[in-house]
């Protein structure tokens, strides 16, 4: 198989929504030799909505949630890490700095006032446009309160109290979102607005494995979500019933993958697992399609931590979590059963053939590197709102059988369901997140809705 076509296939799996499988697989069994179940995160109810945003920015390590100190006083070392991460994120706005390098307090006790004034100092060091309304005559805490970054009255802020790691992370997260919104910055995303009478659909194309540069998103995307009555996704990965999926992806007769594929394929699988630093028996009880979909994602990440962050910043996961936190109803366009059947019903010989394609990609000397590059290109197209660029990236090799399962009949069914939403009585607004390939590919969901006579507008 030509190299370009092989890497394109990996990318299409990501764009077409099938990586939800591997995200689910990661919750079913430990694929990495050293993987252990994490402790419950230490996050307060008051902070969780803000941290659902801030954790995607890459300004602090996610393991802070689990190390037992998140709700304790922040140490000078962690404060330094947070300030450096926040500065790196703000640097990406492209503003010139007044001073090349700033110093921040290293006192043993970092107070709430220290955190707030330090974050203000960091922001004030940039040559900001008028939209920030930053003037020399407004005190740092007054400015931060005025912009909604600090909640409550000055008397109730307990400024002399030691700041917890959680409090500092929330303050930094709010600052980043404010700065990006004031600058009119943020990831552009791929979003269409479809209207009929009083009904509106916001169609957001998803990349199922993300990166921190995809956050914060443009304020207009977040506002469209906030204005919507409900969220529609391919399948609800966080709340769906996994039992049917578990049944379909595993052998139930006591046999293993070794009993169902050729000796050559099994040996190739063992070599791939060794290269990925996975246990040799990690997938013994699973069918070829389950192994393919899981391995297709592992090739994108250099280590388990990067893989975890890629899943965390996936667009689907972000909006499903956001809907849960805000009480917004979540509906499925397809569901676990449909996607499980889509793969499980493929003839065993074809499953093995596609598994071999995946294994060849992993074992190729540059395979994982090129696979990661393709994903990065797709993510950058999403960040820049380049629907045409993404469509060109995905168009290679759409003729094969696997691609036809991913794109085609599924899109027709999605378009029919979306049309029903547009024909509902009264005024209704829905936010619809599915794999970007379903939207950017010619003749699929967006074009099908246009053909039905609905008004479709690409938002940039």
Predicted regions and their residues:
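N-terminal propeptides
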Residues: 2-5, 21-186
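Solvent-exposed, acidic/flexible segments
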Residues: 43-47, 72-76, 108-112, 133-137, ...
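A cross-kingdom marker for long, charged
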Residues: 400-460
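Sec-exported extracytoplasmic/periplasmic mature domains
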Residues: 56-60, 84-91, 95, 120-128, ...
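Bacterial Sec-dependent N-terminal signal peptides
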Residues: 1-14
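N- or domain-start disorder-to-order transition segments that initiate the globular core
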Residues: 182-200
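Extracytoplasmic/secreted envelope proteins and their assembly/folding machinery
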Residues: 51, 76, 80-84, 112, ...
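Structured, acidic catalytic/metal-binding patches in enzyme active sites
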Residues: 196-402
């Amino acid at each position: 198989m030509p190299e370009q076509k092989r890497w394109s296939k990996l990318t299409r799996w990501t764009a077409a929504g099938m990586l939800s499988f591997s995200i689910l697989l990661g919750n079913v069994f430990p694929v990495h030799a050293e993987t252990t179940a994490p402790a419950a995160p230490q996050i307060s109810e008051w902070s969780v909505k803000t941290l659902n945003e801030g954790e995607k920015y890459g300004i602090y390590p996610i393991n802070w949630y689990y190390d037992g100190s998140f709700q304790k006083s922040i140490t000078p070392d962690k404060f330094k890490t947070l300030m450096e991460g926040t500065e790196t994120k703000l640097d990406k706005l492209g503003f010139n700095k007044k001073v090349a390098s700033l110093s921040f307090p290293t006192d043993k006790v970092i107070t709430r006032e220290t955190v707030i004034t330090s974050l203000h100092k960091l922001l004030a060091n940039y040559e900001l446009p008028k939209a920030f309304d930053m003037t020399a005559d407004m005190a740092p805490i007054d400015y931060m309160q005025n912009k909604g970054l600090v909640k409550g009255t000055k008397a109730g802020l307990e400024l002399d109290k030691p700041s917890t790691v959680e409090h500092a992370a929330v303050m930094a997260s709010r600052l980043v979102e404010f700065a990006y919104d004031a600058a009119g910055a943020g990831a552009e995303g791929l979003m269409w607005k479809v209207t009929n009478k009083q009904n509106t659909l916001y169609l957001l194309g998803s990349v199922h494995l993300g990166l921190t540069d995809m956050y914060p998103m443009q304020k207009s995307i977040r506002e469209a979500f906030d204005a919507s009555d409900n969220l529609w996704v391919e399948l609800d990965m966080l709340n769906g019933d996994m039992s049917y999926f578990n049944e379909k992806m595993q052998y139930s007769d006591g046999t293993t993958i070794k009993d169902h594929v050729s000796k050559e394929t099994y040996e190739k699988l063992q070599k791939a697992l060794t290269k990925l630093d996975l246990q040799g028996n990690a997938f013994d009880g699973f069918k070829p399609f389950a192994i393919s979909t899981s391995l297709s994602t592992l090739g994108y990440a250099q280590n388990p931590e990067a893989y975890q962050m890629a899943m965390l910043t996936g667009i689907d996961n972000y909006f499903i979590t956001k809907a849960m936190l805000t009480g917004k109803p979540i509906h499925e366009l397809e569901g676990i059963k449909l996607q499980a059947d889509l793969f499980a019903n493929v003839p065993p010989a074809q499953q093995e053939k596609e598994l071999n394609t995946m294994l060849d990609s992993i074992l190729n000397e540059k395979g994982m590197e090129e696979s990661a590059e393709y994903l990065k290109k797709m993510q950058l197209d999403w960040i820049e709102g380049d629907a045409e660029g993404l469509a060109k990236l995905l168009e290679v090799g759409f003729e094969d059988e696997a691609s036809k399962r991913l794109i085609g009949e599924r899109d027709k069914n999605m378009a029919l369901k979306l049309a029903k939403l547009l024909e509902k009585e009264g005024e209704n607004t829905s936010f619809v997140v599915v794999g970007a390939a379903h939207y950017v590919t010619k003749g699929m969901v967006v074009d099908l809705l246009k053909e039905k006579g609905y008004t479709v507008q690409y938002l940039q």
